[in-house]
Structures are given as C-alpha cells and as structure tokens.
Amino acid sequence: MTADRPALRTGDRDTRLSFGSNLSSFTDYLRGHAPELLPENRIGHRSHSTRGGDGMESGDLAPHGTTIVALTYKGGVLLAGDRRATQGNLIASRDVEKVYVTDEYSAAGIAGTAGIAIELVRLFAVELEHYEKIEGVPLTFDGKANRLASMVRGNLGAAMQGLAVVPLLVGYDLDADDESRAGRIVSYDVVGGRYEERAGYHAVGSGSLFAKSALKKIYSPDSDEETALRAAIESLYDAADDDSATGGPDLTRGIYPTAVTITQAGAVHVSEETTSELARRIVAERTEQGGSAR
C-alpha cells in the first residue's frame, strides 16, 4: 500500500458498491441517496385516509389532469391530450401541458394528480437520458416501459391516499420487424401494472370511455399521420362533450389539444398551428351537423 493511497475502509467500499450497483438507474440512485426528491415523497405526510382533514376528498386538494389518447398509424404513433386540469368541481387550469417527449423515440401523457404526474414524467425522461449516458446505448422500448412501471409502482403510497398517477406511454420500436407497424402503446394501472394495447388505440383519464368510443368508430391502422391526428382531436372533442373534466378546443382563448408524433425520424411536437386548424375544422363541421358526428 502506498502512502498517497489510503486504505479503503469497509464503509467506503460498501458505499461505492451500492452506488455502482444502481448506477444506470437515476431513480434508484435518488431512492438511496435523496429519497425526499422522488415525486411520491414530495406530497408531505398525510393520513392514509382518502379524505382531507377538513372533510374534502383528496381529489379536491390538488389539480388533476384528465384525458389522454394514443393511436398508431402506418409508420408511427401519436399521443394527444386536452389542456384542462380540475380540482374538485372547479377548473384549476385551462392550458396544462399533459404530453411530454421523454426521449428521441418515446413520449408519455399524464392523467391523475397533475403535480406528481408531471414530476414523475420529467424524472422518467432524466432516467432514460442517464441510462444512455452510463451504458452507452439507449433502453429498448420494453426497457422503457418496465422502468416507467417501476416508477408508477413507487407512487403506490400516494395513490392509496387518492393521489394516483396513470401515465400512457407511446414509442417507436426500432427493433420491430415491420417498420410500418413499429408504433407501440403501453398503459398502466395505479399499482404499476403495464399493458400492451394491441387494438391500435387507447385512452386514459376521466374522459377515456368517451374518447375510446369515438376512436372505435373512426380509427384505421392504415391511416396516415394527418388522418390519425384528426381522429385523436375528434375523440378529445367527443370526450369533452360528455365529460366536464375534459377540455375541448377553446376557440375564444385560442387553447387547443397538444400532440406528439413519433416515426422512424424521431419524436416531434405537433405545431399549434396544425392542431388549431384541425380543431377549428372539426368544430365547424359539428356545428353544421347540429353537434353530432358525421
């Protein structure tokens, strides 16, 4: 042993080994070294009851995101969401961003408790970037889906208090045999169960029942990107028509759904100009038809 290199103490060795074992997972590193920074640990200590101390439901205490839709099309997949967040029977926000690009070939939408969900998806994006920097290769789509499932499972304690987070993950699978069918959709339950959605479309949130009913009638797996985007916006319009927690196109304030498309070229945010034009066209057509679909 040299004089300028002191002996490694047992505690130091254990720390280094612990650090190295979870090095590729930024979430695991936070859990071991700064657990208070994880989304599920930033809500404060509350009773395990689903009611607040003043008799309010926990859903009334924090804004909730509502409806997200996803659908595959020939050569890609898209994710779209409305902009409304509710707090009990009030509109907490009219222009929440619920759709996020998480890396070059994936995106996630959020439904549930908005504050926790936004932090969770942002942490997920850091997780993917951290893994690629450490390992030198990006995670496969299945790897991404499993990582997000683990993070949702970590929020179980908050979910049992009524502060649930339900993301919707989409991505372009670079390992797919058929490039025209490489778009994939994965949904989750509040305990972290992951489910591959093979119908080609899915929706989560309070308006999901109405959105999926609309997509069932107009969805085609062979549609192009523009047709798929129109179907997504139309399904959100139908959801908003029946679900008060889902916000439809707001022509007065200029607030429209947001969307992300993912193809072999990567993930791209759809411009507001494109979504607003489609939304205005749909509203005009519905107005001519007395509010009913074509």
Curated annotation (Swiss-Prot):
Enzyme class: hydrolase
Physiological role: Component of the proteasome core, a large protease complex with broad specificity involved in protein degradation. The R.erythropolis proteasomes are able to cleave oligopeptides after Tyr, Phe and Leu, very poorly after Arg but not after Glu. Thus, displays chymotrypsin-like activity, low trypsin-like activity but no caspase-like activity.
Residues at the catalytic site: 66 (nucleophile)
Similarity field: Belongs to the peptidase T1B family.
Cellular localization per UniProt: Cytoplasm
Domain notes: In contrast to M.tuberculosis, the propeptide is required for correct proteasome folding and assembly. The propeptide is positioned strategically at the region where it can act as an assembly-promoting factor by linking its own beta-subunit to two adjacent alpha-subunits at the same time.
Molecular function as annotated in GO: endopeptidase activity; threonine-type endopeptidase activity
Activity regulation remarks: The formation of the proteasomal ATPase ARC-20S proteasome complex, likely via the docking of the C-termini of ARC into the intersubunit pockets in the alpha-rings, may trigger opening of the gate for substrate entry. Interconversion between the open-gate and close-gate conformations leads to a dynamic regulation of the 20S proteasome proteolysis activity.
Membrane found in the keyword field: no
InterPro entries: Ntn_hydrolases_N (IPR029055), Proteasome_sua/b (IPR001353), Proteasome_suB-type (IPR023333), PSB_actinobac (IPR022483)
Alphabetical list of Pfam families matching this protein: Proteasome
Protein known as: Proteasome subunit beta 1
E.C. designation(s): 3.4.25.1
Subunit (UniProt): The 20S proteasome core is composed of 14 alpha and 14 beta subunits that assemble into four stacked heptameric rings, resulting in a barrel-shaped structure. The two inner rings, each composed of seven catalytic beta subunits, are sandwiched by two outer rings, each composed of seven alpha subunits. All four combinations of alpha- and beta-subunits (beta2-alpha1, beta2-alpha2, beta1-alpha2 and beta1-alpha1) yield fully assembled and proteolytically active proteasomes. The catalytic chamber with the active sites is on the inside of the barrel.
Keywords assigned by UniProt, alphabetized: Autocatalytic cleavage, Cytoplasm, Hydrolase, Protease, Proteasome, Threonine protease, Zymogen
Biological process according to GO: modification-dependent protein catabolic process; proteasomal protein catabolic process
Highest taxon in the source lineage: Bacteria
